[in-house]
């Protein structure tokens, strides 16, 4: 099932389809995201709105649904970015959307008190995905890769392992946290 989670009705349909198919929802991973790089003064209203609609409002829509439908003992994992800590030029709007996600996650972890639902963020550093590499020069990609003490880009599997841990029973005691899976870049 695909949906534009920034649209409330589509987010509701997505959640309803999951409930119908599986009977319950134990884990929500909010991974939808868009990024338009530009300086703040050059950011168009359209780019600003699209990033906030998908990256923040989409997460909000799914969190609102999960807070009422997620099973006791469930987990919510929201994807953020280590750019929130790096404060790189041209990432201002994108980082702002993800900072909002981190704040909502921490607050929701407290609002779900007594439901035994863990809410966390995973904040990847530069990871070799289409979203990261699109529109960037190889020189810039190499520069970011070398900022990490591990001197490489993260791989999708590096991030998936952290998400899997947080979704597992072993990771359930972790709650209200931002895990910066970035090879030490921040």
What positions do the PLM features span?
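Active-site helix of classical SDR
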Residues: 63, 97
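A conserved structural motif in NAD(P)-dependent oxidoreductases
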Residues: 148-159, 170
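Short C-terminal tail/terminal secondary-structure segment
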Residues: 86, 164, 175-186
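Substrate-binding pocket helix/loop in short-chain dehydrogenase/reductase
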Residues: 39-40, 44-52, 132, 140, ...
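Alpha-helical segment proximal to the catalytic Tyr-Lys
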Residues: 68, 110-114, 172
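Active-site loop-to-helix junction immediately N-terminal to the catalytic Tyr of the SDR YXXXK motif
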Residues: 43, 87-95, 107
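The beta1-alpha1 cofactor-binding region of Rossmann-like NAD(H)/NADP(H)-dependent oxidoreductases
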Residues: 3-13, 45, 157-158
